[in-house]
Amino acid sequence: MAIQKVSNKDLSRKDKRRFNIESKVNKIYQNFYSERDNQYKDRLTALQTDLTSLHQGDNGQYARQVRDLEEERDLELVRLRLFEEYRVSRSGIEFQEDIEKAKAEHEKLIKLCKERLYSSIEQKIKKLQEERLLMDVANVHSYAMNYSRPQYQKNTRSHTVSGWDSSSNEYGRDTANESATDTGAGNDRRTLRRRNASKDTRGNNNNQDESDFQTGNGSGSNGHGSRQGSQFPHFNNLTYKSGMNSDSDFLQGINEGTDLYAFLFGEKNPKDNANGNEKKKNRGAQRYSTKTAPPLQSLKPDEVTEDISLIRELTGQPPAPFRLRSD
């Protein structure tokens, strides 16, 4: 019985609460329904007032919002302007940096090209100097005169091969080219070439001087004896020391070859001048007081190159660093 009483009491409380809520809702509904027209009229009046104020520009809230939007717009425009100016200035700075970088690279490239060009030129100069040194050495070995030898005449060609002696040389020691001349047939062409060049440049008068110089003719058939003594001081001393026998042997060797005598002195009868030369031999060493040695003819670059190649080949050295010209 007690449990039923409690449940009835609880049910009564729930019903009472629900009843109160329903009564409140009904009251609100009735109030709204009764004041519905007034609410709509007030709302419509407020909207019309706002529209009128908006059209007239008297609405403060609307004006404030418009002003805020304008300020925000101006701020964005200023920001955009500053950004454009920044981009323009930055582009100019980057452009100048690119120009400076390009100039630096250009100068660096020019410097590198100059260094390589200078290096190439220096290498070429060094190579040409080496070639010139080799040519000078070849010329010295071919044409230098050694005045320390007590005898002026030197036979570089055998009597059994050609039947006559080659041109005189003042060197007492054989150089590399002289030994090559005695052993190699290729140098015979060079000796003849030098002899022909000397003959073409000096002419008949120089040949007569050479005849006087080699045979010991003091006065000469053309009157050249007055200037022979001073032009060959070294040969004067050497001839004075060597005596008359060497001159006689040399003259006899030349007289044995008629072609050689005609080639050297331009005369076909070597016996005609032999007696006159023997008579004039006893005048002493003063006949060489004024005569100088004939000028040596320089070789052409191709001839020097051939001589150097032949010297290297005979001495067992490697080939020259320069090449022969091919016409």
From Swiss-Prot:
InterPro entries in UniProt: Sds3
Taxonomic superkingdom: Eukaryota
Coiled-coil portions: 61-135
GO molecular function terms noted in the UniProt entry: histone deacetylase binding
A GO CC annotation given for this chain: Rpd3L complex
Residues recorded as bearing Phosphoserine in the entry: 166, 211
Quaternary structure note: Component of the RPD3C(L) complex composed of at least ASH1, CTI6, DEP1, PHO23, RPD3, RXT2, RXT3, SAP30, SDS3, SIN3, UME1 and UME6.
Family, per entry: Belongs to the SDS3 family.
Protein name: Transcriptional regulatory protein SDS3
